[in-house]
A protein has these predicted regions:
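Glycine-rich phosphate-binding loop
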Residues: 3-42
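Short glycine/serine/threonine-rich phosphate/pyrophosphate-binding segments
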Residues: 1-2, 66
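C-terminal binding/interaction regions
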Residues: 36-96
Length: 96
């Protein structure tokens, strides 16, 4: 995901990006590595391109938890990530 986000950021056509995905924990520590590197990579792109990126990547124990966080309404984590990215883009514009 970080590579795809970097390619989009490199286009220079967006004021913000929103990442959406889910990482479901299995029986090995692989989950921790994938989740951590995904977050770190996206944070690196944010700082490299000075571009707000809403982090809507869910880290859950099972599919039911993912579905609960993706339901319509105020608690939707994708919605929260999009709003955070838009608010940060607005703040950065006001600070420039």
């Amino acid at each position: 995901m970080p590579l795809a986000v970097k390619r989009i950021a490199n286009l220079g056509q967006h004021k913000a990006i929103v990442t959406l995905g889910v990482i479901i924990k299995g029986d090995t520590p692989h989950f921790d590595f994938v989740a951590g590197e995904c977050a770190r990579g996206i944070a690196d792109v944010t700082l490299e391109y000075d571009l707000p990126i809403g982090f809507g990547v869910l880290t859950v124990n099972n599919v039911d938890q993912a579905l609960a966080r993706a339901e319509e309404g105020e608690a939707n984590k994708g919605r929260e990530a999009a709003l955070a990215a838009l608010e940060m883009a607005d703040l950065l514009e006001r600070l420039s």
